[in-house]
Amino acid sequence: MKKLAVLLAFLVTNGSQVSAFDTADLKKFKDTNYCRKCDLSNADLVNGYLKGADLNGANLNSANLKGANLKGANLKHTKLHFAFLWYADLEGATLQGANLKGAKLDFAFLWYADLEEAYLRNADLEGAYLEGVNLKGAYLGFANLNGATLQYADLESANLNSANLNNANLNSANLKGANLKGAVLCNTIMPDGLVIDRGC
């Protein structure tokens, strides 16, 4: 009986940690496209038209934004842990200091987006389009960038420790001061246009 009580307490506690979005915040956002520092965790925003949205400092942990249009959106300092952003359009979006740990950004469009000092540990960016993106000082440790396009990307002082850069295109990218320790560079196009095979 005691064990059952402990188990129930555990489930209740963990259930509260996976709490859903605030319904009032979601309504406000849908009505105004503005929701700074609000709670939209676990919200279903699949294919949403959110162009130019202001979500500065919002909680979007585990939110489903697959295919969403977030062009030019303000996502500074947002929490996007394990958020689903497959095929999302984030062209020109601002994600400075955003926490994208474990986020799913497969084949997302991030042309000229600003991710300066963003946290992308274990993020999945397979096949993502990152031309001209600002990743200065960003943390990309253990991130999956297999097949990602990073032409003209600014990765100055970025941390790519143990990142997967297989088949990635870094042609004309800025890697000044970047940490590539342990990164997998197999069939990877480097800034000078040469193809490198390291860790294959």
Model regions and ranges:
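Sec-dependent N-terminal signal peptides
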Residues: 4-13
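Sec/Tat signal peptide C-region and signal peptidase I cleavage site
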Residues: 16-20
